[in-house]
């Protein structure tokens, strides 16, 4: 049984996850309409893939959390562990790959650098995405053996703390290799944000001689993209902190309240960042405002029918 505080927090994280699925579903729907209208772009493709992956991430986090709360014996089963581990590696790595690709796409489209390497990357943006896709496949090929290794050690020493049977250095190396792709894409996101800051600084210096209106428009674009990138980095850090809290609370402390707090923190990244993307993207923002107006009109029509 859950306490009152645990029940309230569980309702909160469940409601937030539903909103996150709806937000990502809206991005998916808006890009599907653009695809039907033959207005599908590279950014649209990345946003679509990102929305799909984040819906799966939310579902995995919430379903796994509910199982840990109400059916912990199922979580301890071999079948559940191996299936969830493989699915999590694929979906989580792919989600961060799409987010990093989006950040890099914004950098190449908005930033202005005179270096020939930047011009080369800007002209061959598809090649850059293919390179990142190759990095994703390499990260999978490294992560899968580490997942099997950790699972086998846990299976052999089921009744004892299985971490004891891995040397400390080996244990750290195994988890670094397991998340090597995530670490790489996270570093790319940080570098992208740093380059955008430099681009904004150079842009402000160059635009001092031009009209203030032109300057403000370009600066606004830079600042808007920087907010998206910084929010991504912060939320991703919180996401992994939440997963760590959730895992430790289940394996070591067996604290349900701490487990639910971990769920809340880990769900913030896939849920909140989707709404940040909607507000930062002019097309998605207009589509969301249009959808809200249609809902209001539908509600008014329904109220009028009820009064009659």
Curated annotation (Swiss-Prot):
Residues 29-41, 100-124, 201-227, 279-308 are cytoplasmic. The chain crosses the membrane at residues 8-28, 42-62, 79-99, 125-145, 180-200, 228-248, 258-278. Residues 1-7, 63-78, 146-179, 249-257 are extracellular. It holds the Pfam family TAS2R. InterPro entries: TAS2R. Its main location: membrane. It is a multi-pass membrane protein. Keywords: G-protein coupled receptor, Glycoprotein, Membrane, Receptor, Sensory transduction, Taste, Transducer, Transmembrane, Transmembrane helix. GO terms for cellular component: membrane. It is found in: Membrane. It comes from the Eukaryota. Glycans are attached at residue 159. GO terms for molecular function: bitter taste receptor activity; G protein-coupled receptor activity. Putative taste receptor which may play a role in the perception of bitterness. Several bitter taste receptors are expressed in a single taste receptor cell. Belongs to the G-protein coupled receptor T2R family. This is Taste receptor type 2 member 106.
């Amino acid at each position: 049984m859950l306490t009152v505080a645990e029940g309230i927090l569980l309702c909160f994280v469940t409601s937030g996850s539903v909103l996150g699925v709806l937000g990502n579903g809206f991005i998916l729907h808006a890009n599907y309409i653009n695809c039907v209208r033959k207005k599908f772009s590279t950014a649209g493709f990345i946003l679509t893939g990102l929305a799909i992956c984040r819906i799966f991430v939310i579902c995995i986090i919430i379903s796994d959390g509910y199982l840990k709360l109400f059916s912990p014996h199922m979580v301890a089963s071999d079948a559940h562990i191996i299936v969830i581990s493989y699915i999590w590696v694929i979906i989580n790595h792919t989600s961060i790959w799409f987010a990093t690709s989006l950040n890099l796409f914004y950098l190449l489209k908005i930033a202005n650098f005179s270096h020939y390497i930047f011009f080369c990357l800007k002209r061959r943006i598809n090649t850059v995405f293919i390179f990142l896709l190759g990095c994703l496949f390499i990260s999978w090929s490294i992560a899968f053996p580490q997942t099997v290794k950790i699972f086998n050690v846990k299976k052999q020493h089921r009744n004892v703390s299985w971490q004891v049977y891995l040397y400390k250095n080996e244990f750290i190396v195994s988890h670094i290799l397991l998340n090597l792709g995530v670490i790489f894409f996270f570093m790319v996101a940080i570098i992208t944000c740093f380059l955008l800051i430099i681009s904004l600084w150079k842009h402000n210096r160059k635009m001092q001689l031009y009209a203030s209106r032109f300057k403000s428009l370009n600066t606004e674009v830079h600042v808007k993209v920087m907010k998206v990138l910084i929010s991504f980095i912060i939320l991703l850090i919180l996401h992994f902190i939440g997963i760590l809290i959730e895992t430790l609370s289940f394996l070591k402390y067996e604290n349900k309240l701490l487990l639910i707090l971990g769920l809340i923190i880990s769900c913030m990244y896939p849920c909140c960042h989707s709404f940040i993307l909607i507000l930062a993207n002019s097309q998605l923002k207009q589509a969301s405002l249009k959808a809200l107006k249609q809902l209001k009109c539908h509600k008014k029509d329904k109220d009028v029918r009820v009064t009659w």
